[in-house]
Amino acid sequence: MTLNNEKNWTIIQISDTHLMDQDHLEFVRMNPEQSFHHVIQHIVERHPQIDAFVHTGDLAQVPVPRTYQRYLDFMQSLKTPFYQVPGNHDNAEHFPFHQQQNKVHVIHFGPWSVVLLNSAVKGKIDGWVDEAQLNQLEQILQEFAQQHIVIACHHHPFEMQSKWIDQHKLKNTQDLTAVLAKYHNVKIVLSGHVHQESWREWHGIQFYSTPSTSVQFKPLSDHFALDEQAPGYRILQLNTDGS
């Protein structure tokens, strides 16, 4: 689907909202519902022209229908297109994602295309992008060879130098990068899961993780530890020239 043909596009990445089944309940000493709403308010006050939100997983900490329904109701009230991929805490049976979890989905913004991958595996904390999706991804990169590509998934492909979270990274990064290495139109890979900001470059591709809208994890920690950084989000300004 093509959303518009303007020259510049603003995409907001949010991640790891960890919503509870009741909006007053806390997650790790924070009310994730209130924090999520405050982050969104901060975004819309400063960025009046948003083309889409992309949520990179762990919408829910308690993954039941009413949790997801509150998320949907709130996001729909913003009157801005929004998309999401599942995280390890999400439940595909109740998830407000596309029904076919092993199908790769693509959203077009003029010369840019955002590709949504599902790295969540039922019953696992670790991530894995299955062969069916990798094959579809390769077909998409071939079909849209003239497009600038952004890929979004939940699990981080590369280590964060944080032992406890790195054991739960994307486990088949080599399979993913083997596909990406064949094409020169992939510009950005977005992920969540790690509750912190990070950046690295690989073969000219920018890999970003984004802060959670709830609690943050302490960087470079061998053991689970929280950080005092505030909740956050990522802004992508996509230009016609591919920058």
Predicted regions, residues:
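Binuclear metal-dependent phosphoesterase catalytic core
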Residues: 5, 179, 201-243
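Metal-dependent catalytic neighborhoods of phosphoester/phosphodiester hydrolases
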Residues: 23-25, 55-76, 91-103, 127, ...
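Active-site neighborhood of phospho(di)ester-bond hydrolases with catalytic His/Asp-centered motifs
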Residues: 13-15, 52-58, 82-88, 118, ...
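Beta-strand-turn-beta hairpins that frame and shape the catalytic cleft
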Residues: 3-13, 106-116, 141-148, 201-207, ...
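Acidic/histidine-rich helix-loop elements
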Residues: 12-35, 60-61, 91-101, 123-131, ...
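N-terminal active-site segment of His-dependent metallophosphoesterases
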Residues: 1-70, 160
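His/acidic metal-ligating clusters that form di-metal
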Residues: 38-52, 127-206
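Short, electropositive alpha-helical surface patch
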Residues: 65-81, 168-177, 204-213
